[in-house]
């Protein structure tokens, strides 16, 4: 359970804080799939948030189907994969209780939540998820069509890829690119490289790969979503962004950022 416990420590140390109150960490029970899967049996709602790979998600759903109670709702936090692909191998009773609930990072501060319904998802399930996220979690629920990337990432990931590719093509430094492609263009103050760090460089690589696999051949995304040698090299060297030892930037003990 060491990785899960370490994740809680990072959660408490994060700046800005990721919890509304530090004491709320006591509501989180760390665990790992191989040892604690039986604890899911009594859950009312399970949110899957594993790596953005269809094969891994499908394998997990097969295990979940045999472990959860008959009325448990299951949703995925996938940011790109259509629901029809996620549950194509699952029985009807699982599909009826399955949806996509995509939260944006950092979840505490980003109000948007994308809700996607499958062809067989029950209306009662969708209405429960919409109501809970609206009234209890205070989210702005947007019901999306079942298309790759939904709304936010279908546009946002394309924009990030264009920004990074153009910065490299034009020979801009990380600071120059983020100064231009930040607040002046209505992008968060992180800019594009800083946002890559915030999301996670390894996660972004999975997201880009996922969209590249499931979008049709003629889609414009393929012009900007190919393999990036710089990104691959950074991941190989452990530079995965804010959650690791740094990415395009590195946080210092003084609370400032250094460009790597």
Place the predicted regions along the sequence by residue.
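N-terminal glycine-rich phosphate-binding loop for ADP-containing cofactors
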Residues: 1-260
């Amino acid at each position: 359970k060491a990785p899960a416990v370490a994740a809680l420590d990072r959660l408490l140390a994060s700046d800005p804080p990721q919890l509304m109150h530090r004491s709320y960490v006591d509501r989180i029970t760390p665990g790992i799939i191989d040892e604690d899967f039986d604890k899911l049996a009594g859950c009312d709602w399970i949110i899957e948030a594993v790596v953005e790979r269809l094969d891994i998600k499908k394998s997990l759903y097969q295990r979940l189907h045999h472990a959860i109670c008959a009325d448990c709702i299951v949703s995925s936090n996938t940011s790109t994969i259509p629901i029809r692909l996620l549950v194509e191998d699952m029985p009807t009773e699982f599909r009826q209780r399955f949806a996509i609930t995509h939260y944006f990072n950092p979840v505490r501060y980003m109000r948007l939540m994308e809700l996607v319904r499958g062809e067989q998802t029950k209306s009662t399930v969708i209405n429960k998820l919409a109501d809970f996220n609206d009234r209890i979690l205070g989210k702005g629920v947007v019901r999306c069509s079942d298309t790759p990337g939904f709304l936010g990432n279908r546009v946002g990931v394309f924009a990030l890829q264009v920004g990074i590719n153009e910065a490299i093509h034009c020979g801009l430094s990380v600071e120059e690119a983020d100064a231009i492609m930040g607040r002046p263009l209505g992008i968060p103050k992180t800019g594009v490289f800083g946002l890559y760090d915030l999301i996670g460089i390894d996660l972004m690589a999975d997201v880009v790969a996922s969209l590249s696999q499931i979008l049709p051949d003629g889609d414009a995304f393929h012009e900007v979503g190919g393999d990036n040698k710089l990104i691959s090299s950074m991941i190989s060297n452990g530079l995965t962004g804010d959650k690791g030892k740094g990415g395009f930037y590195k946080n210092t003990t003084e609370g400032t950022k250094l460009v790597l």
